[in-house]
Amino acid sequence: AGGAGGLFGAGGTGGHGGFADSSFGGVGAAGGAGGLFGAGGEGGRGGHSLVAGGDGGAGGNAGMLALGAAGGAGGIGGDGGTLTAGGIGGAGGAGGNAGLLFGSGGSGGAGGFGFADGGQGGPGGNAGTVFGSGGAGGNGGVGQGFAGGIGGAGGTPGLIGNGGNGGNGGASAVTGGNGGIGGTGVLIGNGGNGGSGGIGAGKAGVGGVSGLLLGLDGFNAPASTSPLHTLQQNVLNVVNEPFQTLTGRPLIGNGANGTPGTGADGGAGGWLFGNGGNGGSGATGTNGGDGGDGGAGGIFFGTGGTGGAGGVGTTGTGGDGGAGGAAFLMGSGGNGGSGGAGLTAGGDGGDGGNAGSFFGAAGTGGAGASTKAGGTGGTGGNGGLFANGGAGGSGGLGGDAGTCLFYTSPSPRDRG
């Protein structure tokens, strides 16, 4: 695990899990806890494996007066060769929790790509109790053989702040992963968007309900049984309509998620507050389509949307992951999307979004896909006045796939 920070120091980054060719990849270590004013450290990424990728480490919790950090990305399940189910992607690490009173939670790590099942996205960290937004859940990993990974759940905000967006479900030719659940607002703030379902009939996650006094429900939130809450939502929708029509973003509310499989960009968050929408995943094709960029966060507070994952290239190159959306004044940048797998070359990871000018964590770059020619990891976002820059994404492994005619993949419940 990463070392704990001093009074003003950030916690250390957790070590990365090791590579394994015939067993489970190593688990990434947790990031260190921050000092009193320090941010938590980044979780380490899980190790690659031909059987099952290691899980990413959790982001370290921040000091009492500081910010959380992002969870490590899940390890990539290796190719088991021809006529085989192949490997299972590792789960993304949980985002670190913010300080006691202020600060946003860290984003969950993305689930790893698996030639059998994609890894589950990590849950977003929780914000400080007074002010701050919940961290975004990580995107589920692509599952080429069976099921895409489930998107991570969005974190819980403070009294003032938005619930974290749920991560998008991973794509699959068989069964797409379901989107993650959006975080619920407390007093003032929007509920987080439910993550979009992955290509392959994945279902959208349930959106979070807004704060008690002011805020808009997240995408795919359940219908309210309270007449007062329903009236509040109807009034806000009427107020938002001219802003949305004239400027392309609401006054209060989250941006819309990009449609899965189109590479559409996520919408921008509200002029006052709101999270950016998640970018849509890229299309599967001869060459995979690029993932959409995450939408920008709201002006006063709001988290940038997570970039969409690049599409799978069936005979060519994988698509590049979309860039994470930038925050403006107070909020965390979105994580970049993972590059898509391709037969000849993996896609590059998307760049992480920039942190807010005053408070918030910078987004982590997306991981490059592993294939004959591994993709390049995305660049981490720029930090704000009181935040470090985001970590760069890991590059994909390169090399020809082997042949293993009788190999069978273990089921997820046999992984221990």
Residue ranges of predicted features:
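Conserved small/polar residues in nucleotide/adenosyl-binding loops
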Residues: 407-416
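Glycine- and aspartate-rich repeat motifs characteristic of hemolysin/RTX-like Ca2+-binding segments
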Residues: 97, 107, 126, 131-139, ...
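Charge-centric, low-complexity intrinsically disordered segments used as regulatory activation/interaction regions
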Residues: 136, 165, 178, 190-193, ...
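Glycine-/alanine-rich, low-charge beta-solenoid repeats
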Residues: 7-9, 20, 36-38, 49-52, ...
